[in-house]
């Protein structure tokens, strides 16, 4: 599930959920909505996964 991957990412990076949503999907409520049962679209899921993968590879990687 995407939310589990996001939760791990947030714990490792210390990034606030709203900042993550804004950067990953242009939606500051993304993480809160996913925690409350929202099902992301395939495109959103790909965008979020891409964000997490490229963030890990960048100079700010954890």
Segments predicted by a language model, with ranges:
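Short, basic-rich loop-to-helix N-cap that marks the start of a DNA-contacting helix
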Residues: 32-49
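Short alpha-helical DNA-recognition segment
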Residues: 15-30
